[in-house]
Amino acid sequence: NTLLVCAAVIRFRHLRSKVTNFFVISLAVSDLLVAVLVMPWKAVAEIAGFWPFGSFCNIWVAFDIMCSTASILNLCVISVDRYWAISSPFRYERKMTPKAAFILIGVAWTLSVLISFIPVQLSWHKAKPTSPPDGNATSLDETVDNCDSSLSRTYSISSSLVNFYNPVAIMXVTYTRIHR
């Protein structure tokens, strides 16, 4: 379905001329990236019973967070776009230019990359390893065949606020105002 959405917008000129469809394409791309960069790797690991991709784990975790964040932020941008289009249609036509749309899309994707890759590459996202009962300091998290994506409490809370709760609150407000 995602590919069909992209193909339709690319194929039909009247769909390309609507700024709103830029946001739809951005959402479709984020969903497509989940299907390409996240799901296959996890499926192979689940089938194999271990993580066969070694140090690719951190990059995979960053892609997972990035794609999920991009999807949510794109949904948020779409809700704001629809609110502006409905609440101020004449101003919307003047202000929501392709340039403005690309800026909003760029902000959503930039935030997604920053929120995912920086914390993951700096290991801010990881829960502190716990020592096993035998007192050995190594953790399962450190083994090559385990891609443990357990999150630290601080990262989990801050990431949830920025990546999920704030965008959902914005969407709830915009759609509530639209339906009034």
Swiss-Prot record:
One of its GO terms (cellular component) is ciliary membrane. It is found in: Cell membrane; Endoplasmic reticulum membrane; Cell projection, Cilium membrane. Residues 11-21, 81-99, 180 are cytoplasmic. The chain crosses the membrane at residues 1-10, 22-48, 58-80, 100-124, 154-179. GO terms for biological process: adenylate cyclase-activating adrenergic receptor signaling pathway; positive regulation of MAPK cascade. InterPro entries: Dopamine_rcpt (IPR000929), GPCR_Rhodpsn (IPR000276), GPCR_Rhodpsn_7TM (IPR017452). It is a multi-pass membrane protein. GO terms for molecular function: dopamine neurotransmitter receptor activity, coupled via Gs; G protein-coupled receptor activity. Disulfide bonds join 57-147. Interacts with DNAJC14 via its C-terminus. Interacts with DRD2. Interacts with DORIP1. PANTHER family: ADRENERGIC RECEPTOR-RELATED G-PROTEIN COUPLED RECEPTOR (PTHR24248), D(1A) DOPAMINE RECEPTOR (PTHR24248:SF139). Belongs to the G-protein coupled receptor 1 family. This is D(1A) dopamine receptor.
